[in-house]
Design a protein with these regions (language model features):
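Short, charged beta->alpha transition segments
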Residues: 109-116, 138-142, 223-226
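Short, solvent-exposed loop/turn elements at domain surfaces
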Residues: 24-31, 68, 132-135, 302-303
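"Short basic amphipathic alpha-helical interaction patches in structured regions
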Residues: 33, 138-142, 168-170
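Sequence signature of WD/YWTD-type beta-propeller architectures
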Residues: 2-9, 19-21, 33-34
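Extended, small/polar residue-biased N-terminal targeting/export presequences
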Residues: 26-122, 351
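C-terminal "post-core" interaction segments
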Residues: 8-17, 120-124, 128-131, 144-151, ...
Length: 374
């Protein structure tokens, strides 16, 4: 007896698996209002896996979400450790903005992380992507090279994001404590709320499920990690950004600005950031034959602001405090250096030397929320 599945049956199973996965993981329930109508819409038309994928793409497009898609290129895929994790917040990262202090060869892609210390003790740190497992270790090594600086330029131009967890962990090099970000996921019992924190000893995240039959709050186990040394805490900081600064890198900016010491954080850029307050997770179906990226969560700044979804429904981007029109790389870097020198001079004039003791308790005065572009 032949028990092998027909091409049509395999195609139907594949299409249905995609429909089911998106239906239980996609964050915005309002866009799933008519999702049930897609379950059997193409049953009579699907005759193999190729046609199943073609119709699945049409189904996914109905969500009007640029980031929920079937992944074609294997190099863009990051396998999640579990359905509740968010290992990859974004798609393939864009190339970093170039800078005159970079040491990349012209025919090579920019390195993900580099740092330099000028003779006048200005530290420069470029992070072009958070989309790799070892990014925190790379940043740690780069930070160590500029730990003796008097002020820092953090270059996040062109950084389209990557792994949210790693981006939040990197905040520990600049901050001593505080709420870093809040994420909201769909959950079978309601909404799962995840928050990232720093304290003197730990980098940790908490998970709570809100809702369910009792409309109560269920606290899940807290994940604790040894924090990274705050080698740059308290030092004047200028952050470089542009229109391609997005998602996890925007999370980092919000955390650094809203937890930073007032008068010691400044943003310079050629335009407002992308305004990508959403995160994606990647999934494999049919033993890796199909790879999907699904918008899984919304994230919020420490102050509660949502940056939007890159303008699909909203775009509430981060505005630079100092605008540099037509920046090609060197222009904004020069302005950033000038702004940093102004802060250093102001601190010297006021006799403020608190940055000499990284890891010491912060003052009570923190920076205002980043300017949001509506």
């Amino acid at each position: 007896m032949n028990i092998s599945k027909t091409a049509s049956t395999q195609g139907l199973e594949l299409y249905h698996a995609i429909w089911e996965l998106v239906g239980v993981t996609f964050f915005d329930k309002s866009r799933l209002a008519n999702w049930s109508s897609w379950e059997h819409k193409f049953d009579e038309l699907i005759d193999n896996e190729e046609s199943a994928l073609r119709y699945a793409d049409e189904m996914l497009a109905s969500l009007n979400d640029t980031y929920t898609e079937r992944l074609i290129a294997p190099s863009t895929f990051v396998s999640p450790s579990s359905a509740d994790d968010l290992p990859a917040a974004d798609g393939k990262s864009a190339d970093a903005a170039t800078s005159p202090t970079a040491v990349d060869k012209p025919d090579e892609k920019p390195t993900d992380v580099m740092s330099a210390l000028t003779p006048s003790k200005i530290g420069y740190l470029r992070i072009s992507s958070f989309d790799r497992e070892d990014i925190v270790e790379l940043v740690e090594a780069a930070v160590a090279k500029i730990a003796n600086c008097e002020g820092v330029i953090l270059d996040l131009r062109g950084n389209s994001g990557g792994r949210m967890h790693q981006a939040m962990e990197c905040c520990g090099f600049f901050l001593d404590q505080g709420l870093l970000a809040t994420l909201k996921f769909r959950h079978e019992e309601g909404v799962k709320i995840r928050q990232y924190f720093l304290n003197e000893d730990q980098f940790f995240l908490t998970d709570e499920v809100h809702g369910g039959s009792s409309n109560g709050i269920t606290k899940l186990p807290t994940d604790l990690y040894k924090r990274r040394a705050p080698l740059l805490f308290g030092k004047p900081l200028v952050i470089l950004l542009n229109r391609r600064t997005a998602s996890a890198s925007e999370m980092m900016i919000c955390a650094l600005v809203q937890n930073g010491i007032a008068g010691r954080v400044h943003m310079v850029g050629s335009a407002a950031t992308a305004g990508k307050g959403i995160g994606q997770a990647d999934y494999e179906l049919f033993e890796g034959k199909v790879k999907l990226r699904v918008t899984r969560c919304h994230w919020f700044a420490p102050g509660g602001e949502w940056l939007g979804d890159c303008g699909q429904t909203e775009r509430n981007a981060i505005e630079p405090e100092t605008l540099v029109d037509g920046d090609t790389g060197p222009e904004a870097l020069k302005v950033a250096a000038d702004e940093l020198r102004k802060m250093l001079c102001a601190n010297e004039a006021s006799g403020d030397t608190s940055s000499d003791a990284p890891g010491s308790a912060p003052t009570d005065s923190h920076s205002a929320a980043p300017a949001i572009a509506n």
